[in-house]
Amino acid sequence: MRILKIISLTASTIILLLVIVCAVIWTFNPLAPDVVVADPAPYGQRINDDGLIANFYPVDKPGVHPAILLLGGSEGGIGSTRMAQALQKQNYAVLALSYFGAPEQPKTLELIPLELFDQAIAWLASQPNIDGDKLAVLGTSKGAEAALIIATRHPELRAVAAGMPSSVAWQGYDPNLLKQIITPPDGSWSLKDKPIPFLPYTREYVDGPLEIYEKSLVEQSNYPEASIPIEVVGAPVLLVCGELDAIWPSCDMARQIKERATERQGPDVTVLAYEKAGHAGFGVPLETDHSRFSQLGSIGGTAEDNNFARIDSWTKTLEYLRASFEVHQEHVGN
């Protein structure tokens, strides 16, 4: 009988472990793709300057031009070539920054120094043919979280655009699942070698990435300092989100940001929420015969609905950038 009990307990333990492993595998992709550090040629150049790893896309026209710091998401490296070149064609100089994952950079999205973004903005402002009074930051997903945090520290920015944004600073992320489980990462971001306040992930059972963020946000009131202080941002803010986002509840968090800004007399916040779009609903639209078109429907919504959101939101993003820089020019002129 004792042997049967031992076998039963052992089997139960194994089943429990399998359930936990399956839940984690569903939440965090164990087969994370190789980090891409895209070749900037022929329209840009690689920057490797005192820890700054980026692709720079200058404007090939006379005069001085606005500049944009461009931030990708939790994929790491530099994979936003299409967006960078699309902005470059609109006469914006673009610095597509890698903040983790590239050679000689951290392999985990943990304790990324905010000073790195300070350095990137200073580098941009110092370049010839760039108007240092016309700077913006644009980020997607985890890069949107970073963009909003950066904006709270840089009142000189004239525009802040965030696709699939977060209203809080989150715990970090390690693509190595075993390490993620055994030694959970610290916060995503640091300042002066210390983590900034962050919202930790729930330790409850979850069924997919969306649920981990939804359950974690339930505890947000217990971590008030993790909320991004949008009220101190000095520029108008544009937020783009998909109601069917399967990664995190970007529209709920976008509305949180707008509500906080309104309650605390912060900047104007515009939310573009797309009912049928998912996490891929922001960015440069793709042609329907593009090799990656079908992937637009892999993280919420259909490929067609996500591309529709891209067509609409990208047009409005360009209008927003143009208007933000023009308003600043009018204020300077007065």
Q: What do these predicted ranges mean?
A:
Residues 88-104:
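Conserved alpha/beta-hydrolase
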Residues 233, 239-241, 245:
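Short beta-strand/loop motif that positions the catalytic acidic residue
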Residues 129-141:
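Alpha/beta-hydrolase fold nucleophile elbow
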Residues 255, 264-334:
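C-terminal catalytic histidine-bearing segment of alpha/beta-hydrolase fold enzymes
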Residues 107-128, 149:
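Alpha/beta-hydrolase active-site loop
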Residues 27, 31, 149-215:
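Hydrolase active-site cap/lid region
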Residues 22-66:
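N-terminal cap/lid segment of alpha/beta-hydrolase-fold proteins
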Residues 65, 72-77, 243:
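Active-site glycine-rich loops that stabilize anionic/oxyanionic intermediates
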